[in-house]
């Protein structure tokens, strides 16, 4: 059975904090493949960046990760292509139902808390929850074999912060984003 680390998110844009989260997990856990799953339509966020631009940045992020880690990395664009209104949890269930794969989902504590609130978590789903500043899990959070918490030293970066930095012409964002993605953002005038 192939062991997959599934990493869903907006990735608008992908940044060094995302890469660092993956590297932190892979130092402690082993997987056969990493699947990056950019989200499509969302109830909680408006995503103005086009499908084509997000897919292109996703491909650049896969290339960047592939240079840093020793397992294959795939970009899963099922949700970006989503025209029938399915949301992340529905598409992830379809992915996880594939035979011969064991899927563990990497998610920030903010996303996990949102899923819990919406009662979108099946007790059998496997998660690695990466603590994010400002979104600490409750002290009574129940751990089991399907729930692993990482109190990693990942950078406290958000894609929203990066978009705002670009919009405000703060070149400090270039230290937070892989170089080829920075070039893509500038070349396509994203977030300006």
Language model region names:
Residues 1-192:
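Nucleotidyltransferase catalytic core that binds NTPs
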């Amino acid at each position: 059975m192939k062991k997959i680390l599934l990493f869903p998110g907006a990735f608008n844009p992908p940044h060094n904090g995302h890469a660092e989260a993956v590297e932190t997990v892979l130092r402690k856990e082993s997987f056969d493949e990493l699947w990056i799953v950019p989200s499509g339509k969302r109830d909680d966020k408006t995503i103005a960046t086009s499908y084509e631009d997000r897919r292109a940045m996703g491909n650049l992020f896969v290339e960047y990760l592939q240079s840093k880690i020793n397992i294959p990395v795939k970009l899963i664009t099922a949700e970006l292509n989503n025209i029938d209104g399915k949301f992340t949890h529905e598409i992830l269930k379809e992915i996880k139902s594939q035979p011969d794969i064991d899927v563990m989902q990497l998610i920030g504590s903010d996303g996990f808390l949102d899923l819990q609130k919406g009662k979108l978590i099946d007790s059998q789903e496997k998660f690695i929850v990466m603590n994010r500043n400002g979104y600490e899990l409750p002290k009574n959070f129940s751990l089991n074999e399907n729930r692993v918490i990482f109190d990693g030293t990942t950078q406290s970066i958000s894609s929203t912060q990066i978009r705002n930095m670009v919009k405000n012409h703060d070149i400090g964002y270039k230290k937070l984003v892989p170089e080829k993605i920075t070039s893509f953002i500038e070349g396509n005038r994203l977030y300006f």
